[in-house]
Amino acid sequence: MARKMLVDGEIDKVAADEANATHYDFDLFVIGAGSGGVRAARFSANHGAKVGICELPFHPISSEEIGGVGGTCVIRGCVPKKILVYGATYGGELEDAKNYGWEINEKVDFTWKKLLQKKTDEILRLNNIYKRLLANAAVKLYEGEGRVVGPNEVEVRQIDGTKISYTAKHILIATGSRAQKPNIPGHELAITSDEALSLEEFPKRAIVLGGGYIAVEFASIWRGMGATVDLFFRKELPLRGFDDEMRALVARNLEGRGVNLHPQTSLTQLTKTDQGIKVISSHGEEFVADVVLFATGRSPNTKRLNLEAVGVELDQAGAVKVDEYSRTNIPSIWAVGDATNRINLTPVALMEATCFANTAFGGKPTKAEYSNVACAVFCIPPLAVVGLSEEEAVEQATGDILVFTSGFNPMKNTISGRQEKTLMKLIVDEKSDKVIGASMCGPDAAEIMQGIAIALKCGATKAQFDSTVGIHPSSAEEFVTMRSVTRRIAHKPKPKTNL
């Protein structure tokens, strides 16, 4: 009996060793070479993993068959949009320059096609940089559409239509998200943000449907370049989810720069006419535009991945369900970025990808951490926030909340004559004195807020803000000179219920 037990034990050990020694083509195969996918591939390779990655062929406008290394952010998102924001800002700067002694004696023309070409040149440069980063990390790049065909197997359909399968110990889904259009009659006449970044002709009349950051940013961009812009959104104010006081200021700034706002209004029909695209609003009004942009949300780009067929759980929106380590219910399959629909920001995808690489290959299991994630809306002027809004703080409060605000006319505007105030705000938990939220709407808001985000991440108190010496003269110094409480919000315990 003892002999049999020993033999059985040896057999079990050999079987386990053989299972661990299973040969795979790759330690990791990544589907999607956007920000998260490239980061995960590179960092995993740096940990010693053999890595493959696939991505669709490059094109500025994405579809089910075209994409490009770099993903949405680099090719048709954050980067090209910010380039257009810079371009749009110069119009106002030229106006502001007059009171600073600059005389523009000749007519100044804006050439859309020149800016568009410079934008395309830049995203191609970045596309090539991302490819080099992968090559330098010894990551094998395959051009084609990837799909999962088993817990440890992916299939890549190449440009010529041929299909090749690869096995991998781990598979990472990093396919991002895709812009969606509401099912309004005539919706095929509208464009999404993809096309908006690559229009051949500049739209002199633009209609934007949506109240989120993409809608607000494009309204600012086109208006800054001289277009007539009408912005339609369902709520009373744009930018739902942001601090209400900041939302109101953004709305005033948009109107102050000439954007026509249509709150609590949607579109019911689009029709092609000789004069342009005719639009009918939910209030029965008619408008005509050269371009209609639908900026009404994005959805996880997972439909063609075959995930449900191999047992990977998705939520109702099609997002990949993952745990705190970005692992799906199938132990060998993971997901990061917009495909998981957690916080859909490029830096968050990078953070999740880093945590994944540490967990899967670095011997250091690391949970993705989402507290105090800063973000910005690149309208003109921009809005930036970190931590809790006033409304969120009140909702989550266990004690009294202190609100500090500072609204002022920036020094630059006092000379230029521009009537546009900057607003800065701190939210403080009175009991602990910790700063739990910060927001700013005004020039350079995003640049300033990155430093504030570090302070909040480190648990800074209001007393520490107050003891910090400011940089003078600057707008940023207001964050360390707000001494007087604007308002105190008393904590109201939620009523107990037996239901």
Swiss-Prot record:
GO terms for cellular component: cytosol; peroxisome. Its main location: cytoplasm. It catalyses: 2 glutathione + NADP(+) = glutathione disulfide + NADPH + H(+). FAD binds at S35, G36, E55, T72, C73, K81, G146, D338, T346, H472. It is found in: Cytoplasm. This is Glutathione reductase, cytosolic. Disulfide bonds join C73-C78. NADP(+) binds at G211, I214, E217, R234, R240, G297, A376. Binds 1 FAD per subunit. Catalyzes the reduction of glutathione disulfide (GSSG) to reduced glutathione (GSH). Constitutes the major mechanism to maintain a high GSH:GSSG ratio in the cytosol. Its EC number is 1.8.1.7. Its cofactor is FAD. It comes from Arabidopsis thaliana. Belongs to the class-I pyridine nucleotide-disulfide oxidoreductase family. InterPro entries: FAD/NAD-bd_sf, FAD/NAD-binding_dom, FAD/NAD-linked_Rdtase_dimer_sf, GSHR, GSHR/TRXR-like, Pyr_nuc-diS_OxRdtase, Pyr_nucl-diS_OxRdtase_dimer, Pyr_OxRdtase_I_AS.
